[in-house]
């Protein structure tokens, strides 16, 4: 089979002489025009530590593709730093960047008739953005994670960027002074790599490894370690073989492999954002997936790993303990993975895991033994009720009692809620309602790490609930419910909550309820008026116009025609 199935339209024949002329300028020789052209989607950026080491990986991928007998072409794609934009208007662009990344990779690869793509990403939206493009295009592809950051250290404890967010709450509550705040700030992010706990970036990279679109062990490697660059070069060889064999993404991204990915997300205690992203990825791959599927998997999969944000360890500790393959083997041994799922190497999941022990080493406590999990069931629960008729996503970890009924404290923006928390105006038993932060209303569905971290820092993590039509950072934990749908901007019930209303969050019962009569709810709905758009031009205006409900992945290409 020809290896340049797609690129031959720009490299073959007399009419393509001008095309070849330009390719010669970027290094092609006579013998190269019959080779596969492989794109390297390079997320390198000095905006964020998550992506600042990626250029070296792109260069290793380039060398590997050449050695494997194909022609690499590097092109850039963007990133937003969620950690730096957190708590600001800039965070509205974070989820938007998922679509920009997907569109840019699809545009470059399809516009240049590439035969395959190796995508390298670091910060949170790089992963789903790349996978959306890969699923849409359905050309041979592999994802390479830029790698995780190593932990910082202070006073005998490991630090991540979330430590710094929580320190703000501790400082405002008078628990630490200026010196300690600065010490945490200065030590939290010691080098290159994505945020170190089982936050969104590490969650998505782990899920892609479980799904078969990244190489084994690659999702938990440190960005600065030599094995990460070695794994990138190996990924290049695997991709060129996949091009030769025409192993396509939609042969890998199937219902079974997505179930595998979700099972691993539950087992490692991953981010709520994975729900949103996999709904979108499944749609791009023409796989049926709903919120109810997450709930079904949650009910049967335990949380096996003691990882931050609510646990003790970081991703590099998981790597030393056996990484994602060890977690997967435990799930496979107990009938919770589909071993016959194909991977990018051409092997099945069962074949890859054949030599992995069924139980983790007894000399570590990052991965718990099967009979001693962190939680007996998954931590990402799908709640419904009159406040979320389409559903909401709860991450109930690090709290003693997963049920709360309390008075609503209503805020029309993240900033207003944070001001109230830092001013000491939130009391134990309150339920914060942060609304008009959904996909359309924000727009952009900002992450609420600043307020949730401030709550934790103030010592209220066990005593306060928070619901929002926005999202949460993977670094969030506590009694938090996000992705409330329908969102406020389209008249969802969250828009109808009034200060002091009684609200119940009941994770075991999967309930999110506004405790008022149906008659009163109907009266409020009749009086509700949609707010004016916050943006009327530019990318946020376009996004608000196109984006769908979070309950179906907040996609922007639904029902366009």
Swiss-Prot record:
- Name its co-factor(s): [2Fe-2S] cluster; Mg(2+)
What function is annotated for this protein? Functions in the biosynthesis of branched-chain amino acids. Catalyzes the dehydration of (2R,3R)-2,3-dihydroxy-3-methylpentanoate (2,3-dihydroxy-3-methylvalerate) into 2-oxo-3-methylpentanoate (2-oxo-3-methylvalerate) and of (2R)-2,3-dihydroxy-3-methylbutanoate (2,3-dihydroxyisovalerate) into 2-oxo-3-methylbutanoate (2-oxoisovalerate), the penultimate precursor to L-isoleucine and L-valine, respectively.
> Could you tell me which InterPro entries the record lists for this protein?
DHAD_IlvD/Edd (IPR050165), Dihydro-acid_dehy_C (IPR042096), DihydroxyA_deHydtase (IPR004404), DiOHA_6PGluconate_deHydtase_CS (IPR020558), ILV_EDD_C (IPR056740), ILV_EDD_N (IPR000581), IlvD/EDD_N (IPR037237)
Q: Which organism is it from?
A: Nostoc punctiforme (strain ATCC 29133 / PCC 73102)
Give the reactions, separated by semicolons, that this protein catalyses.
(2R)-2,3-dihydroxy-3-methylbutanoate = 3-methyl-2-oxobutanoate + H2O; (2R,3R)-2,3-dihydroxy-3-methylpentanoate = (S)-3-methyl-2-oxopentanoate + H2O
Whether Transferase counts among this entry's keywords is no
Keywords tagged on the record:
2Fe-2S, Amino-acid biosynthesis, Branched-chain amino acid biosynthesis, Iron, Iron-sulfur, Lyase, Magnesium, Metal-binding
Record's family?
Belongs to the IlvD/Edd family.
Q: How is the cofactor bound?
A: Binds 1 [2Fe-2S] cluster per subunit. This cluster acts as a Lewis acid cofactor.
Q: Which residues form the active site?
A: 473
Annotated residues for binding of Mg(2+): 82, 124-125, 447
Q: EC? A: 4.2.1.9
User: Which of the residues bear the PTM N6-carboxylysine?
Assistant: 125
Q: How does it assemble?
A: Homodimer.
Pathway the protein takes part in: Amino-acid biosynthesis; L-isoleucine biosynthesis; L-isoleucine from 2-oxobutanoate: step 3/4; Amino-acid biosynthesis; L-valine biosynthesis; L-valine from pyruvate: step 3/4
What name does UniProt use for this protein?
Answer: Dihydroxy-acid dehydratase
Taxonomically, what lineage is the organism? Bacteria, Bacillati, Cyanobacteriota, Cyanophyceae, Nostocales
């Amino acid at each position: 089979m020809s290896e340049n199935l797609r690129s031959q339209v720009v490299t073959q024949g007399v009419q393509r002489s001008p095309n070849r002329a330009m390719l010669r300028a970027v290094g092609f020789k006579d013998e190269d025009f019959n080779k596969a052209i492989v794109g390297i989607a390079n997320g390198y950026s000095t905006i964020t530590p998550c992506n600042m080491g990626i250029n070296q990986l792109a260069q290793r991928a380039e060398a590997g593709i050449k050695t494997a007998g194909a022609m690499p072409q590097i092109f850039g794609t963007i990133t937003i730093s969620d950690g730096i934009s957190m708590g600001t208007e800039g965070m509205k662009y974070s989820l938007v960047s998922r679509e920009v990344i997907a569109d840019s990779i699809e545009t470059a690869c399809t516009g240049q008739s590439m035969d395959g793509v190796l995508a390298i990403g670091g910060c949170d939206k790089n992963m789903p953005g790349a996978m959306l493009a890969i699923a849409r295009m359905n050309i041979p592809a592999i994802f390479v994670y830029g790698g995780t950051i190593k932990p910082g250290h202070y006073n005998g404890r490991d630090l991540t960027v979330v430590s710094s967010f929580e320190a703000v709450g501790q400082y405002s509550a008078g628990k630490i002074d200026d010196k300690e705040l600065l010490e945490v700030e200065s030590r939290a992010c010691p080098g290159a790599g994505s945020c170190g706990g089982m936050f969104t970036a590490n969650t998505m990279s782990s899920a892609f490894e479980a799904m078969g679109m990244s190489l084994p062990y690659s999702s938990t490697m440190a960005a600065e370690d030599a094995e990460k660059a070695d794994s990138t070069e190996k990924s290049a060889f695997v991709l060129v073989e996949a091009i030769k064999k025409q192993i396509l993404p939609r042969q890998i991204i199937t219902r079974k492999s997505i179930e595998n990915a979700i099972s691993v997300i539950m087992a490692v205690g991953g981010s709520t954002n994975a729900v949103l992203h996999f709904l979108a990825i499944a749609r791009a791959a023409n796989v049926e997936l709903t919120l109810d599927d997450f709930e079904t998997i949650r009910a049967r999969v335990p949380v096996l790993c003691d990882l931050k944000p609510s646990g003790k360890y970081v991703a590099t500790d998981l790597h030393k303990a056996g990484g994602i393959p060890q977690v997967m083997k435990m799930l496979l041994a107990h009938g919770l993975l589909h071993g016959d799922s194909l991977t990018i190497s051409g092997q099945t999941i069962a074949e890859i895991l054949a030599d992995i022990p069924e139980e983790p080493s007894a000399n570590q406590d990052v991965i718990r033994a099967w009979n001693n999990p962190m939680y007996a069931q998954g931590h990402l629960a799908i709640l419904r009720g009159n406040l979320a008729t389409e559903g909401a996503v709860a991450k109930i970890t690090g709290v003693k009692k997963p049920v709360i009924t309390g008075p609503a404290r209503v805020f029309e923006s993240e900033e207003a809620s944070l001001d109230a928390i830092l001013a000491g105006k939130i009391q134990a038993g309150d339920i914060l309602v942060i609304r008009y932060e959904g996909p359309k209303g924000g727009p952009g569905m900002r992450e609420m790490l600043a307020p949730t971290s401030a709550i934790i820092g103030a010592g209220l993590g066990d005593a306060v609930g928070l619901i929002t039509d926005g999202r949460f950072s993977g670094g969030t934990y506590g009694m938090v419910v996000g992705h409330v749908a329908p969102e406020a901007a389209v008249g969802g019930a969250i828009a109808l909550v009034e200060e002091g209303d009684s609200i119940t969050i009941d994770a075991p019962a999967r309930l999110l309820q506004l405790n008022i009569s149906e008659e009163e709810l109907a009266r409020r709905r009749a009086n509700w008026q949609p707010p004016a758009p916050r943006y009327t031009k530019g990318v946020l205006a376009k996004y608000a116009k196109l984006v769908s409900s979070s309950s179906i992945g907040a996609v922007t290409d639904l029902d366009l025609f």
